[in-house]
Curated annotation (Swiss-Prot):
It is found in: Cytoplasm. ATPase subunit of a proteasome-like degradation complex; this subunit has chaperone activity. The binding of ATP and its subsequent hydrolysis by HslU are essential for unfolding of protein substrates subsequently hydrolyzed by HslV. HslU recognizes the N-terminal part of its protein substrates and unfolds these before they are guided to HslV for hydrolysis. ATP binds at residues 18, 60-65, 256, 321, 393. CDD domains: RecA-like_HslU. GO terms for molecular function: ATP binding; ATP hydrolysis activity; peptidase activity; proteasome-activating activity. One of its GO terms (cellular component) is HslUV protease complex. GO terms for biological process: protein unfolding; proteolysis involved in protein catabolic process. Its main location: cytoplasm. A double ring-shaped homohexamer of HslV is capped on each side by a ring-shaped HslU homohexamer. The assembly of the HslU/HslV complex is dependent on binding of ATP. Belongs to the ClpX chaperone family. HslU subfamily. This is ATP-dependent protease ATPase subunit HslU. SMART domains: AAA (SM00382), ClpB_D2-small (SM01086). It comes from Citrobacter koseri (strain ATCC BAA-895 / CDC 4225-83 / SGSC4696).
Length: 443
């Protein structure tokens, strides 16, 4: 679990997301409250439940990006789902309980990686011994069993030294490695994912722990042996329990496009993919127990963050019970021309940095001037105003159009330097931006 303070979390998010300070503060406080809760005594800790968040804002302003970056910072089980993929229980489609099952699966993977990393030092020692056994087979007794020697031989010590110094990396050896499990791919019908994953696990375990001799270079063998030995040191039962605890105490679920499951107008008949899904989400958000293949998971202390554009529907169109379970409302603002300028220059891997790096692979040096950046931002904002407002995503379409000629001819421009200023941008984009019909279809 992350121990970062709210200020540190916001500072980290600022490296990738421009503006939206209120949303950043809310998720930073929610993330820090997970840590604060774990410092309480057990009785009080059980009573403190997370305050779920509803993020409201037009498309392309950073809602999903906040979720993506939060997943990396959280160091906790995290899953992002689309609300539109689910249907009410009993109908064809995924049911909402699969959110918790997927969250538990991601926690199992996360805890396994952590356990393997924890045991890496011991695994490296054991892998080294297996490679030395392949290079200098130990003496055998009358029954064909390897004899245990009190002291390693001088030859073994000499090979160990060479192995650690990397002198034997390219030497080929034959070692026995665990055979890869039998791959059985089963296409799951909607709503049957849990059963098919259990069938796959059963088929994979049929092969047992067979070993297969393989010829490999020592450096490649070392990597595979370390993974194999580290996996042996992991206790599957402890791993499952640790993963379930991590989900129950620190799990975070991000539900995107929640506005798309609002009921629209008067409609007769069952609303299985809208209001029905909202009703199914209620027990998950409120707290219930979900059965997974790894064990029972309680959702009482899982943090839910929902987001939606709410351009057609309003937050009040959600059923009242669900509104009450999302007490913290955060409104994200539409982006301005100044925001677009900052998006093009400030983030760590901004779009302009990416284009410069891509063209540098062909030996072309691209330079974006301040006037050029400003003109690109103005063009993107103008197209958003006259057609559909898709937020910062418009910058990608505008830049792709602007860079089309350079990208196409890059291999012939090796060693050249190209400056993208206001004049260059106007020459390539003004006609498209001015003509609403063209910009609607091209930009």
């Amino acid at each position: 679990m992350s121990e970062m303070t709210p200020r540190e979390i916001v500072s980290e998010l600022n490296k990738h997301i421009i503006g939206q300070d209120n949303a950043k503060r809310s998720v930073a406080i929610a993330l820090r409250n997970r840590w604060r809760r774990m410092q309480l005594n057990e009785e009080l800790r059980h009573e403190v439940t997370p305050k779920n968040i509803l993020m409201i804002g037009p498309t392309g302003v950073g809602k999903t990006e906040i979720a993506r970056r939060l997943a990396k910072l959280a160091n906790a089980p995290f899953i992002k789902v689309e609300a539109t993929k689910f249907t009410e229980v009993g109908y064809v489609g995924k049911e909402v309980d699969s959110i918790i099952r997927d969250l538990t699966d991601s926690a199992i993977k996360m805890v396994r990686v952590q356990s393997i990393e924890k045991n890496r030092y011991r695994a490296e020692e054991m892998a080294e011994e297996r490679i030395l056994d392949a290079l200098i087979p130990p003496a055998k007794n009358n029954w064909g069993q390897a004899e245990q020697q009190q002291e390693p031989s001088a030859a073994r010590q000499a090979f160990r030294k060479k192995l650690r110094e990397g002198q034997l990396d390219d030497k080929e050896i034959e070692i026995n490695l665990a055979a890869a499990p039998m791959g059985v791919e089963i296409m799951a019908p909607p709503g049957m994912e849990e059963m098919t994953s259990q069938l796959q696990s059963m088929f994979q375990n049929l092969g047992g722990q067979k070993q297969k001799p393989r010829k490999l270079k020592i450096k490649d063998a070392m990597k595979l042996l370390i993974e194999e030995e580290a996996a042996k040191l992991v206790n599957p039962e402890e791993l499952k329990q640790e993963a379930i605890d991590a989900v129950e105490q620190h799990g975070i679920v991000f539900i995107d496009e929640i506005d798309k499951i609002c009921k629209r107008g008067e409609s007769s008949g069952p609303d299985v993919s809208r209001e029905g899904v909202q009703r199914d989400l209620l027990p998950l958000v409120e707290g219930c127990t979900v059965s997974t293949k790894h064990g029972m998971v309680k959702t009482d202390h899982i943090l839910f963050i929902a987001s939606g554009a709410f351009q057609v529907a309003k937050p009040s169109d959600l059923i009242p019970e669900l509104q009450g379970r999302l007490p913290i409302r955060v409104e994200l603002k539409a982006l301005t021309t100044e925001d677009f300028e900052r998006i093009l220059t400030e983030p760590n891997a901004s779009v302009t940095v990416q284009y410069k790096a891509l063209m540098a692979t062909e030996g072309v040096d691209i330079e974006f001037t301040e006037s050029g950046i400003k003109r690109i931002a103005e063009a993107a904002w103008q197209v958003n105003e006259t057609t559909e407002n898709i937020g910062a995503r418009r910058l990608h379409t505008v830049l792709e159009r602007l860079m089309e000629d350079i990208s196409y001819d890059a291999s012939d421009l090796n060693g050249q330097s190209i400056t993208i200023d206001a004049e260059y941008v106007s020459k390539h984009l003004d006609a498209l931006v001015a003509d609403e019909d063209l910009s609607r279809f091209i930009l």
